[in-house]
Amino acid sequence: MIAVVAGPTATILNTPPMGADPAALVPQRLGEDVSIEVVGHSGHPIDEHLNSATDKAGRTVTLARGQLVALPLPAGAGPAEQSFFPSAERLYEELDALWTDEAGRTGTLGRLARYRHFRAGPPAGYTGGDAPEVLGVDYFPYGAWESRAEPDIGTLMTITNKVQEIVGAPDVAGVQWLEGSPVIEETLYWLGLLIDTGKPIVGQVAQRLHRSIGSDGGQNLVDGVRYIVSQAWNLDGRGDAVGAVLVADGVVRTARGAYKVAGRPGGYAGGGPVATCTTRWPIRLEYRPLRRHTRDSAVRISELPREVRALDGAGGSRLVQVKDSSGRLAPEVLPVVDIVVYGRYGIQGGACGCADLGVKDAVSHNVERHGLAGFVLEGIAPNGWASRAVESSLSAAVYSGFPVVWCGRGRPEDPVGTTPAPFVAGSNLSATKARMLLLACLLRFGAAPAAQDPDRPTDAERRATAAYIGSLQEVFDTH
């Protein structure tokens, strides 16, 4: 059994607007059994050419009630309220009923595995009935300004709990996670850090809408299923040795290394290939990633403490709950990590107070509002340097209780290397992925020790901070 989870802004679950063209064929269910006459030998132009007109007599085809058939919309039918599917059930049904594999057979997905469908921050919502779902709370599409919504950190906690619950079912062999192609790399990396499992987690995307010309989602899903059932990931017989992966365009990439670089099929780079998914050969691994993940991650859910220390906004600290009695992430634990992007030729010095890119203001805000917070500096590639004003303010941020990770800009290939105290070196992670790992570290280690005077910490305060930063550095070096 493969669990299929519909996540936010998933293009793979999106469709063109219905009713835009009255002649457009849309998969619909037949209301009753139907017998129709088709022209003989009209399924292929060569057959039409080779057969005489007398051999093109009508042939009767019988279609059953409830069968999906591509037909024009009935007269007067209006556009659908939402273009996204609320889950992947209908998508899988259409792919199996209306599409064929290269051998001309339908039911490609159904022949490979059985499926159970779930929703975790899905792209469409059920807005009727006694408990209508709410845009931006229960579901997250993209599109026109008034009809799009982005999930927040609370939604990420909900997603994490849901996926952990799903993989815990004994009959689930693996998970397909469906999300929007520009952002799946962040969520997938997070799931690979937090989810405690030996089962594969496969990210699935599409660059083009389902039902549209050149739609790529169907083949990506088939390749993802083939990867799961191949057991190629189970190298030592102990479970997944690869970690969360993105399967798209016939390539299996690690969640940590994959990046979207273009808005088209083939628009991902990095992360492999761990394996390739050619249709004619079995899937096998090309290399095994060495970073810790899932069942071996130092920040997986089972390794997180029940409580961690957070700042209280009054110069002291308090304990905040990370997990409830059942081991699920507590809904009220909402860490915050801001990305500071450095570019040369900014304003240096002066009385405007903007030379540090707003870091001091962000620190003041975090002290008042967020007990668990941190920063990622996206500095010069690959070493993460910025201006002295920015670095000085970020140093004070660390001694205020907010750890700071240095990263190179863009999609760095070389690691940051050794950073000056009191910063964490972000290895070769992008700023967005370093942010996800720092969020996980805040859940594992809590806030950094805060100095009485963050601009002038004592030797003892420096040692306490260094010990804390060392714990984070070990995680960043291995995950």
Q: Where does each model-flagged region fall?
A:
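Active-site histidine-anchored catalytic micro-motif
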Residues: 1-479
